[in-house]
Swiss-Prot record:
Cell division protein that is part of the divisome complex and is recruited early to the Z-ring. Probably stimulates Z-ring formation, perhaps through the cross-linking of FtsZ protofilaments. Its function overlaps with FtsA. Belongs to the SepF family. It holds the Pfam family SepF. Residues 39-51 have a biased composition (Basic residues). One of its GO terms (cellular component) is cytoplasm. It is found in: Cytoplasm. Homodimer. Interacts with FtsZ. One of its GO terms (biological process) is FtsZ-dependent cytokinesis. It comes from the Bacteria. Residues 25-64 are annotated as: Disordered. This is Cell division protein SepF. Keywords: Cell cycle, Cell division, Cytoplasm, Septation. InterPro entries: Cell_div_SepF (IPR023052), Cell_div_SepF/SepF-rel (IPR007561), SepF-like_sf (IPR038594).
Amino acid sequence: MNFFEKILVFLGLAEEAEEEIIEDEEDVAPVNNSTFQEKKHKKRSAVQRKQKNSDQEGDSVVPLHSTKNTQGIKIHLIAPSKYEEAQEIGKYLKSGFPVVVNLEQLEMETAKQMIDFVSGTVFALDGNLHKIGQQIFLFSPPNVGIDGAIDTTGDEFFDQKTYEEYE
């Protein structure tokens, strides 16, 4: 598992890959080819019946192991230089993409307004807001789960006490 995959697993955006179990050749009994084909056909028919039944039942059945998504989840990284870029962040969130926002280039008042706007968008979408650095935030839509936490105690930016002093 490479470094990027480990980060995605940590953030809950991907699942850990399972190791394959390889059987010894000695343990496997020889199989008659025609018997194998018959069993394969019967098994396929049973699977097709289950799929038809599950299609009729709706989405109440959830697979235990998800299939690997070849596209992956795109995380947008944005360092806005003006307040007008808040709408771009909102569009990404509405489209289902998580966004990491670095507010270090903005004035304090503009950064507050940006946080207010994007936080409102996240709230309306039932998403999540995570502070991951001094002026760096992770905004995620409801379809993206975030596990873990980063300790930002002692950081005054966007601290509720500090935030109230500016009002």
